[in-house]
A protein has these predicted regions:
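Short, flexible loop/turn elements at secondary-structure junctions
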Residues: 26-28, 37, 202-203
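Terminal transmembrane helical anchor/hairpin motif
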Residues: 66-87, 118-122, 127-216
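Membrane-helix interface/capping residues of multi-pass secondary transporters
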Residues: 30, 116-117
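Secretory targeting signals
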Residues: 1-14, 35-113, 157-180
C-alpha cells in the first residue's frame, strides 16, 4: 500500500500540473526520463520491502528463536516436499518481493496512462484488496483462486499469501495438469512485473509523442 501511494503520482502528477510539457523539451525528457523514473520507483519499493522484511524476520527470530523456525513443517500436503519453517519463510519473503515488483510496475503503468494520481491510487488499492475479498467470497471456487493468484497483488493479500497457501495445499488444474498454488503465486509476478514495466514505459513515450507538435510537410 505504501509503495502504491508513493508510485501513483510518478507520471500522473506531471500530466495534471503540465510539468511534463516542460520535461519534454529537455534533452533527456523522453525515454531516458521514463526509464529513470521506473528504475527509481522500483528501487524505492525494493528498499522499503527489504526494510519491512528485515524487521519482520528480526521480530520472528526474537519471539520464536532459530530452533522454532528451522523445525520441519509437518503437514500432510507438504511431507513429500520436506519444507522446513525456514524454507516457508524464504518462500513467503520471495513471493512478497515479487508481488511488490508486480504491483509497483502495475501502478506505474496506470500512472503513465491516467492524469489523476487519486484515480490511480483508487484503482491500485482496489486491486491490492481484491485477493482478500476473493478468498472470502469465492473460497471454494477454482475461478476465485485463479483470479486471486494471477493478480499482481496475489502474494500480498490479507488472509492469503504464500504462508497460507503452503499450509492449505491447494492445486489448480489446467486440463490434466495440476499446479500447486504457491508455484502460480511465484510465477505470475515474474511475468507481470516486466510486462507492466514495459507497458508503462511505452505509455509514457507514446503520450509524449502524441503531445509533440507535428511538422507540416513543405510543398
Amino acid at each position: 500500500v505504501v509503495c502504491s501511494i508513493i508510485c501513483a503520482p510518478v507520471f500522473a502528477s506531471d500530466y495534471s500540473t503540465g510539468a511534463d510539457d516542460i520535461q519534454r523539451c529537455t534533452r533527456y525528457g523522453r525515454k531516458r526520463l521514463g526509464k529513470s523514473r521506473l528504475l527509481a520507483a522500483m528501487t524505492l519499493s525494493t528498499v522499503l520491502y527489504v526494510v519491512c522484511a528485515g524487521v519482520f524476520v528480526a521480530l520472528t527470530l526474537a519471539v520464536f528463536g532459530d530452533d522454532k523456525t528451522s523445525a520441519q513443517l509437518a503437514l500432510d500436503a507438504l511431507v513429500l516436499g520436506n519444507i522446513t519453517m525456514n524454507g516457508v519463510l524464504i518462500l513467503t519473503l520471495a513471493a512478497g518481493l515479487l508481488s511488490v515488483f508486480a504491483m509497483t510496475a502495475f501502478t506505474l503503468w496506470l500512472s503513465a496512462r491516467m492524469r489523476s494520481g487519486v484515480a490511480v491510487l483508487a484503482v491500485t488499492l482496489a486491486v491490492a484488496m481484491t485477493p482478500t475479498f476473493l478468498i472470502v467470497l469465492l473460497r471454494e471456487s477454482a475461478v476465485g483462486d485463479w483470479l486471486r493468484l494471477l493478480l499482481p497483488s496475489g502474494g500480498l493479500g490479507l488472509g492469503t499469501g504464500m504462508f497460507v497457501d503452503i499450509q492449505v495445499g491447494k492445486f489448480l488444474t489446467i486440463g490434466s495438469l495440476a499446479i500447486w498454488t504457491p508455484f502460480v503465486m511465484l510465477a505470475a509476478p515474474v511475468i507481470e512485473a516486466p510486462v507492466f514495466a514495459l507497458l508503462a514505459q511505452r505509455a509514457y513515450v507514446r503520450r509524449e509523442d502524441a503531445a509533440l507538435p507535428r511538422k507540416r510537410p513543405r510543398h
